[in-house]
Swiss-Prot record:
Disruption phenotype: Premature termination of the floral meristem. Residues 9-22 have a biased composition (Low complexity). Cytokinin-activating enzyme working in the direct activation pathway. Controls the shoot meristem activity. Phosphoribohydrolase that converts inactive cytokinin nucleotides to the biologically active free-base forms. Reacts specifically with cytokinin nucleoside 5'-monophosphates, but not with di- or triphosphate. Substrate binds at residues 106, 124-125, 141-147, 153. This is Cytokinin riboside 5'-monophosphate phosphoribohydrolase LOG. It comes from Oryza sativa subsp. japonica. The lineage of its organism: Eukaryota, Viridiplantae, Streptophyta, Embryophyta, Tracheophyta. It is found in: Cytoplasm. GO terms for biological process: cytokinin biosynthetic process; regulation of meristem development. Keywords: Cytokinin biosynthesis, Cytoplasm, Hydrolase.
Length: 242
């Protein structure tokens, strides 16, 4: 949690601090964005449908057209490889964050852009969140869902106000969204928290929705290592070990 807290100290203010796009990269017809970097979560596999692969490339090109740099999981295989190459080939900066232990498995050939090797998954997620102004999930598996749900939860808790989007290719995320809707109807997720999740079937439509997103919660929650030292003992006296 300490590493995630360090990331979110920057992330809470990051959207405002990095809203202005940087110069460089892209072409003369580039559509500017309020986002400097978008973090993309996606699978290290390509999936069984060509539409998933096409969507990864489409998303990469959309980021390039809008002058947005990419933050991602650092792999060169699967959808990660496709989206990172599309952004890099288009002249935008790519930041890949990957645990050292995963490099032999997920990096083949020459990696693109800037590769940051970290100690483990917690540091990876914290670094990706720190660099990003928004988050997009392409189709993926357990790892993609874990990363996605963490930033959704952080938004619900008011730790950050960065938009979170699903690129819902061929209805891939329909079952997930149905589960969220059921959790709302059963009283486990608040209706305003449901609106944290933005989805669209195409990259262009999704990025437009992210641009228009208005946060549901105010940033303000802090982790225990950010609290004043004088307050921490009062908390500790209420905690018992099992």
């Amino acid at each position: 949690m300490a590493m995630e807290a360090a990331a979110e100290r920057s992330a809470g203010a990051g959207a405002a601090a990095t809203a202005a796009p940087e110069s460089g990269g892209g072409g003369a017809g580039e559509r500017r964005s309020r986002f400097r970097r978008i973090c993309v979560y996606c699978g290290s596999a390509k999936g069984r449908k060509a539409s998933y692969q096409d969507a990864a490339v489409e998303l990469g090109k959309e980021l390039v057209e809008r002058g947005i740099d990419l933050v991602y999981g650092g792999g060169s295989i699967g959808l990660m490889g496709l989206v990172s190459h599309a952004v890099h080939d288009g002249g935008r900066h790519v930041i890949g964050v990957i645990p050292k232990s995963l490099m032999p498995r997920e990096v083949t050939g020459e990696p693109v852009g800037e590769v940051r090797a970290v100690s483990g998954m917690h540091e990876r997620k914290a670094e990706m969140a720190r660099f990003a102004d928004a988050f997009i999930a392409l189709p993926g598996g357990y790892g993609t869902l874990e990363e996605l749900l963490e930033v959704i939860t952080w938004a619900q808790l008011g730790i950050h106000k960065k938009p979170v989007g699903l690129l819902n290719v061929d209805g891939f995320y329909d079952p997930f969204l149905s589960f969220i809707d059921m959790a709302v109807s059963e009283g486990f997720i608040a209706e305003d928290a449901r609106r944290i999740i933005i989805s669209a079937p195409t990259a262009r439509e999704l990025v437009l929705k992210l641009e228009e997103y208005v946060p549901e919660y105010e940033v303000g929650l802090v982790w225990d290592d950010q609290m004043p030292h004088s307050f921490a003992p009062d908390l500790e006296t209420r905690i018992t070990s099992s």
